Amino acid sequence: MSLGAVDEGTAELLERFGFDAEEFDELRAQVASGALSAASNVVSGVVGPPAPEDVVALPEPGSDAWREGHEAGLEALAAGRVAQVVLAGGMATRFGGVVKGVVEALDGRSFLGWKLGETGRLGTDLGVRIPVALMTSFATDAGTRAHVAGLEVDEPLWFSQRISLRLTGEGQIFEEEGRASAYAPGHGDLLETIRASGTLAALRGRGVEHVAVSNVDNLGARLDPVVVGAHLVSGRPMTTEVARKEGDMGGAPARVDGRLGLLEGPEFPAHFDQDRIPVFNTNTALFALDALDRAFDLRWLVVRKSVGGREAVQLEHLYHHASWELETTFLEVPRSGPRGRFFPIKEPVDLERSREGLREMLSASVLD
């Protein structure tokens, strides 16, 4: 596909944010042929729940395992060997078109203000500057940069996820008001763009050996020494946090033909009862930095979206599918309370509902 096939403004965005025309043409051909469809989302093979030993609980405070993890995590954080990566991309559609990271979350501070401020406070307590990297998108980059510039935090490293174009069900370019409709193709871009942008090399140059990845809207996913320590003690290159379901739907650890990894909701066969899996993915993870210095073969999922009252096709990939390529620890964490790690805010109503829980959690120090 030639960028000349789209309007000038969209073409500039595509060029700036890493549009891969060759890959796009290959993928749209697969949509047109039916090779990529809602049906292709479903994995082949025998799907079963994880074995009990596949999910490891975060150690209880005061236990020997807790002390071991706390000591290991504290040492790594104090030595500057752990960095934070915040996923601040997406399409900025759920808060009235405002970039979510800049929205006030609690007590006059934005999501980014809390997220970066908590990391800065931990670094101050430990006498170290903890590196932070922000992954934005074409829809959030300018607003996020402007907002962070006004915060009293250390300047983060910046990189962006890529950009793509929505399709019709027949594989043609989907248009809005006569223009090609662009979107951000999922946080799976993290695994490619952290390398391609030079961010991975920059983190390595600062002595970083592990990165903690979390959504900008989940203030519970703080850098906690015990969680970092659990990742280190496991000796595995990837740790994915899961939480007990409370009516939640979404991705979860599963076994496919005996292999353990994380499946997204649409990947489960219709006949499989997802309630057989008691935990779900919180989209928070830790990686050994060296494990990210490679290419990943992530699946593309077909997602149908209503855009301007019409159905559009988006192709998205997800970073937690790296669990099929890297040996992974599935770590069950508390979702609420002072050590709670799952406070997702997807809509404004979620924010109103969660404020007291957030206040309780944020008032507790991860060092206690």
Enumerate the language-model features and the residues they cover.
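Terminal amphipathic alpha-helical/low-complexity segments used for targeting or macromolecular assembly
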Residues: 1-76, 116, 126, 268-269, ...
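Domain-scale recognition of functional cores that engage charged ligands
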Residues: 58-86, 96-320
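Glycine-rich N-terminal segment of FAD-binding domains in flavoprotein oxidoreductases
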Residues: 89
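Glycine-rich phosphate/pyrophosphate-binding loop regions near the starts of catalytic domains
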Residues: 93
